[in-house]
């Protein structure tokens, strides 16, 4: 007991200090995240300088290519020389 006045005013407190086991306080747990974290990769100037620019004219001549934009998605449909149909959907 650090305060002698408390010991004379409350004599039973000294019994508490001698027999009561002292345990360290438990740390407060961190709350669980309410949603998973999404890690975004920020583009830097170095990344942009390494990506090739889109050519003004297509690399291959193709008259059968169709594309549509639906909300924020791009849908591409192309046909190969062998008659195979290729459908690509790009989402942001």
Swiss-Prot record:
InterPro entries: Papilloma_E4. Induction: Expressed in the middle to upper layers of host infected epithelium. Residues 16-59 are annotated as: Disordered. Pfam families: Pap_E4. It is found in: Host cytoplasm; Host nucleus. Residues 14-42 are annotated as: Involved in cell cycle arrest. One of its GO terms (biological process) is symbiont-mediated arrest of host cell cycle during G2/M transition. A motif (Association with host cytokeratins) lies at residues 9-12. Belongs to the papillomaviridae E4 protein family. This is Protein E4. It comes from Human papillomavirus type 16.
């Amino acid at each position: 007991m650090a305060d002698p006045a408390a010991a004379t005013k409350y004599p039973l407190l000294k019994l508490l200090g001698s027999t009561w086991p002292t345990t360290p306080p438990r740390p407060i747990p961190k709350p669980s995240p309410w949603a998973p974290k999404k890690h975004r990769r920020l583009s830097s100037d170095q990344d942009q300088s390494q990506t090739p620019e889109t050519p003004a004219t297509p690399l291959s001549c193709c008259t059968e290519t169709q594309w549509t934009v639906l909300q924020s998605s791009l849908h591409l449909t192309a046909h190969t020389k062998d008659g195979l149909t290729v459908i690509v959907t790009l989402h942001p």
